[in-house]
């Protein structure tokens, strides 16, 4: 029961959409109303406001990081076990994808997933981030970098820790992240996906 309680709290944390919050605070349009319609840092950047995009990126990553770290450090004292920590990781990610506060219209989860991975294991997070940076540098597609990183993340974890409940949670997160990039996959295959640095009008 305590595992589920912590998972619910994590979901509520994940439901805070920093793209929406930052946009409101900085007087920008609702990120659902322009570009890809995705409430994430990449879409916010299409307004031309780099600070807003950076704040969005940091906020989305920090909520994933904070939810898992808090559960890891304080949860055991209340009876939260490894299954509970895995549920928290999955729940905060689901909160980002389907936010309660924003009519369940959430983002794709790249930054939040990164925060979760760093909280689980800094080496895992760094390895996955390095994968993203390498793919992004050579191919200039943010979406492709995210997809490849999502594929490798579960393997990195298993190589380091073996197969356990957290490996299952990371696998589910990766599958969900890939599923959220369906439109990007179609554009990549059609050669129509935007490269990093290309600007789109809001």
UniProtKB/Swiss-Prot annotation:
Enzyme class: transferase
GO MF annotation: an example: acyl-phosphate glycerol-3-phosphate acyltransferase activity
Pfam families assigned: G3P_acyltransf
Topology relative to the membrane: Multi-pass membrane protein
Pathway: Lipid metabolism; phospholipid metabolism
GO BP of this protein: phospholipid biosynthetic process
The keyword Lipid biosynthesis is annotated on this UniProt entry: yes
Keyword Lipid biosynthesis appears in the UniProt entry: yes
Spans through the membrane: 2-22, 51-71, 80-100, 116-136, 137-157, 158-178
Keywords: Cell inner membrane, Cell membrane, Lipid biosynthesis, Lipid metabolism, Membrane, Phospholipid biosynthesis, Phospholipid metabolism, Transferase, Transmembrane, Transmembrane helix
Cellular component aspect of the GO annotation: plasma membrane
Localization: Cell inner membrane
HAMAP family: PlsY
Main function: Catalyzes the transfer of an acyl group from acyl-phosphate (acyl-PO(4)) to glycerol-3-phosphate (G3P) to form lysophosphatidic acid (LPA). This enzyme utilizes acyl-phosphate as fatty acyl donor, but not acyl-CoA or acyl-ACP.
Family, per entry: Belongs to the PlsY family.
Quaternary structure and interacting proteins, as annotated: Probably interacts with PlsX.
Protein name as annotated: Glycerol-3-phosphate acyltransferase
Gene: plsY
């Amino acid at each position: 029961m305590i595992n589920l309680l912590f998972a619910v709290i994590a979901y509520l944390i994940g439901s805070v959409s920093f793209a929406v919050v930052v946009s409101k605070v900085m007087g920008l349009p609702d990120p659902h109303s322009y570009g890809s319609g995705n409430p994430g840092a990449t879409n916010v950047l299409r307004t031309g406001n780099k600070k807003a995009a950076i704040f969005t990126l940091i906020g989305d990553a920090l909520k994933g990081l904070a939810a898992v770290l808090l559960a890891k450090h304080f949860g055991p004292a209340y009876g939260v076990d490894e299954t509970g920590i895995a549920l928290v990781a999955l729940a905060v990610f689901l909160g980002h994808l389907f936010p309660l506060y924003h009519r369940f219209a959430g983002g794709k989860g790249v930054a939040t997933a990164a925060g979760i991975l760093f909280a689980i294991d800094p080496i895992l997070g760094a390895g996955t981030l390095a994968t993203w940076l390498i793919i992004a540098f050579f191919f200039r597609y943010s979406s492709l970098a995210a997809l490849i990183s999502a594929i490798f993340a579960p393997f990195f974890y298993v190589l380091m820790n073996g197969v356990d409940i957290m490996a299952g949670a990371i696998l589910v997160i990766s599958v969900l992240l890939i599923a959220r990039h369906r439109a990007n996959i179609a554009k990549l295959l059609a050669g129509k996906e935007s490269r990093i640095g290309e600007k789109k009008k809001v």
